[in-house]
């Protein structure tokens, strides 16, 4: 399975391109990529970039897929799935737990479903920590054409989705969902 790192965000709350911000001598996005590379189920890591940050992302030596639509995570996932089934994460997720990702991919493979997404008991989804079939791209395309850009709604509208109940998993795995939004968030990973 492909590991797809979404790197097309605008970093408004952070104040600069957070994915290039160095933490312990390395850009944030590389911390995320290294965690993905630690997953036995991930065969290849790609970066999904916006046209604006394509060149910066190409500097890291990974295959870069350009999200020309740039309408949010939905078009990032859509772009990633052009290469096949993918486990998709945000580029600002430096605390990914490889065992958790491998667990989700195993559930995805065993389920035969179009996607496998962690879900909290209140119904909230973690769509940027999920496995998607390349066939999910058709659903995304249809929604994008209709101007419906919320990834969570696209997942909820699909009939063939495997949901993983987060509360039933090891407590430590929840750290995998942590993402950096503001500079104040960095203290959690700079220790």
Swiss-Prot record:
Q: What is known of its domains?
A: The N-terminal domain determines nucleotide recognition and specific binding, while the C-terminal domain determines the specific binding to the target protein.
Q: Which GO terms describe its molecular function?
A: GTP binding; metal ion binding; molybdenum cofactor guanylyltransferase activity
For this UniProt record, give its keywords in alphabetical order, as a comma-separated list.
Answer: Cytoplasm, GTP-binding, Magnesium, Metal-binding, Molybdenum cofactor biosynthesis, Nucleotide-binding, Transferase
Enzyme class, broadest EC rank: transferase
Q: Where in the cell is it found?
A: Cytoplasm
Listed CDD domains: MobA
> What's the name of the protein?
Probable molybdenum cofactor guanylyltransferase
Translocase among keywords: no
Annotated GO biological processes are: Mo-molybdopterin cofactor biosynthetic process
Q: Which domain of life is it from?
A: Archaea
So what family is this one in?
A: Belongs to the MobA family.
- Cofactor(s) for this UniProt protein: Mg(2+)
UniProt-annotated binding residues for GTP: 6-8, 18, 67, 92
Q: Which residues bind Mg(2+)?
A: 92
């Amino acid at each position: 399975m492909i590991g797809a790192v979404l790197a097309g965000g605008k970093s408004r709350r952070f104040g600069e391109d957070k994915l290039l911000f160095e933490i312990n001598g390395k850009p944030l996005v590389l911390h995320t990529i290294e965690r993905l590379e630690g997953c036995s189920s991930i065969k290849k890591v790609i970066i999904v970039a916006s046209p604006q940050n394509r060149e910066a992302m190409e500097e890291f030596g990974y295959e870069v897929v350009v999200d020309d639509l740039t309408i949010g995570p939905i078009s990032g996932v859509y772009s990633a799935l052009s290469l096949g089934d993918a486990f998709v994460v945000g580029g600002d997720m430096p605390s990914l737990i490889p065992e958790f990702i491998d667990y989700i991919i195993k559930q995805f493979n065993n389920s035969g479903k179009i996607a496998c997404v962690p879900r909290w008991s209140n119904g909230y989804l973690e769509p940027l920590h999920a496995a998607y079939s390349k066939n999910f791209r058709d659903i995304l395309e249809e929604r994008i054409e209709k101007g419906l850009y919320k990834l969570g709604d696209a997942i909820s509208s699909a009939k063939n989705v495997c949901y993983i109940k987060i509360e039933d998993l090891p407590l430590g795995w929840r750290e995998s969902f942590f993402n950096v939004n503001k500079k104040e968030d960095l203290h959690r990973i700079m220790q």
